[in-house]
């Protein structure tokens, strides 16, 4: 199993059914892994559209919205849409690639294709949390943490950054116990709540801000 397959497998475990994105030379391994899975992959023509689509999907379904993009300018193109998701408390996960670990030099710009110094720092003002993978053994747990963080209250975007060489690298994958995204409440449960309220003589509702997305 390679790194891209680990990401896709973990997204499936988290209940992800749809992913939006734009392919690029750095993230092709992820696209190939998605094409072999049962996750629906929706291609767009601009990275911002991927993030907006993930936002809209999250609002319409209550599920985690996922957008994938490539390194540097591709990732930066999502910022406007991620900012909107932040303001609207939408649970979306942006997965972007980074230059290979073998090409990283702290504090040094090497001019590698699409290299952006501190790429993850672009997302800190508009996300709930930023996750950066530095080694293969961290991958499954970090993907799971990024997904569950976005979906946990208060729901907001998270950002996950994965070096390109880890997408193609293979290793002996081991199952790890990770927290999972909660499923949206079904219509049957809503009906039970309505029945309880209808039978109450003096019902009192204490409603938090999250009710707007319920």
Predicted regions and their residues:
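N-terminal alpha/beta PP-like core and its mobile active-site loop of ThDP/TPP-dependent enzymes
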Residues: 1-214
